[in-house]
């Protein structure tokens, strides 16, 4: 299938490996699955009762990458989709999702992606989700993802979320339940500007002995934007968790970081850290001595901070 230039540009921004119509993939555009493919070990099926797909990843999957991006380019559209991932015991898979909105009109464009992961035992899953907005229109670009994750015994789940730019409003809801011996790493990166608003609520329940979680949030707030982070780690067994939230605040922005730790077992070990601050003037001065102006120096510092 030949894609138009807007779709190609948005896909380039949200799919770091480059979207290709090869292997297992599904491209959703303006509320319709416009193209999809299966591989030997990954099958994608359209839901019968509502919008969305079921992705079946069998136990013999070894390092395969599945691409399931979403593009919204119709002003005034509200797109709601339900995607369920069924990952068998022992599978090793990379999943690249994400959504980009191009809004050139005066009406809001919105995408709500509801993803549920059912992960078996001894599996390795790397999930990457990027959000991006663009367009010259006055209509807002809104993204509200909901992610529910069930991590089976001794499985490893890595989740990298990035909001690049251009998203006027987002509310992210993430719930994760972990069984014995499972490991979780979540890295969240976010940049807001102008009057954008972003809320991220995350709840991690360590329900099995020996489970461990690391949650890292890094953000930059510019202009008059507002950010709120509320990561919550609940330890019901002998487990480990570490929450770290770091933010750079600029101009007239507001950042609220509310890490919450909840131990319900004497052997639960949970740590949280949170820091909010402005760019260090000494760092700016040092870069300016190398010939950069203030804006360029800020750009270098922000890029290194988010990376």
PLM feature segments, named:
Residues 1-3, 9-11:
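Terminal domain-initiation and capping elements
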Residues 9, 23-29, 34-292, 302-307:
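Conserved beta-strand/loop scaffold segments within soluble protein domains that form the structured core
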Residues 297-298:
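Small-residue helix-packing motif on alpha-helices
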């Amino acid at each position: 299938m030949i894609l138009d230039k807007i779709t190609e540009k948005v896909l380039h921004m949200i799919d770091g490996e480059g979207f290709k119509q090869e292997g297992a993939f599904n491209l959703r555009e303006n509320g319709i699955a416009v193209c999809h493919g299966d591989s030997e070990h990954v099958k994608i099926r359209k839901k019968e009762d509502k919008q969305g797909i079921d992705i079946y990843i069998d136990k013999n999957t070894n390092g395969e990458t599945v691409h399931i991006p979403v593009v919204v380019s119709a002003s005034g559209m509200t797109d709601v989709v339900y995607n369920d991932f069924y990952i068998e015991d022992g599978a090793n898979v990379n999943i690249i999702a994400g959504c980009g909105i191009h809004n050139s009109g005066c009406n809001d464009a919105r995408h709500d992606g509801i993803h549920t992961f059912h992960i078996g035992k001894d599996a390795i899953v790397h999930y990457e989700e990027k959000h991006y907005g663009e367009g010259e229109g006055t209509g807002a670009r809104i993204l509200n993802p909901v992610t529910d994750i069930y991590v089976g015994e001794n499985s490893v789940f890595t989740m990298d979320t990035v909001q690049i730019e251009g998203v006027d409003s987002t509310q992210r809801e993430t719930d994760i339940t972990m069984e014995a011996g499972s490991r979780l790493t979540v890295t969240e990166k976010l940049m807001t500007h102008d009057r954008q608003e972003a809320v991220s609520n995350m709840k991690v329940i360590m329900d099995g002995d020996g489970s461990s979680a690391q949650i890292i949030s890094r953000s930059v707030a510019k202009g008059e934007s507002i950010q709120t982070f509320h990561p919550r780690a609940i330890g019901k067994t002998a487990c480990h968790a570490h929450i770290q939230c770091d933010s750079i605040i600029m101009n007239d922005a507001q950042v609220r970081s509310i890490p919450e730790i909840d131990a319900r077992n004497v052997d639960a070990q949970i740590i949280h850290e949170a820091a909010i601050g402005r760019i260090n003037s000494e760092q700016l001065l040092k870069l300016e001595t190398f010939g950069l102006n203030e804006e360029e120096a800020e750009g270098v510092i922000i890029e290194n901070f988010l990376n």
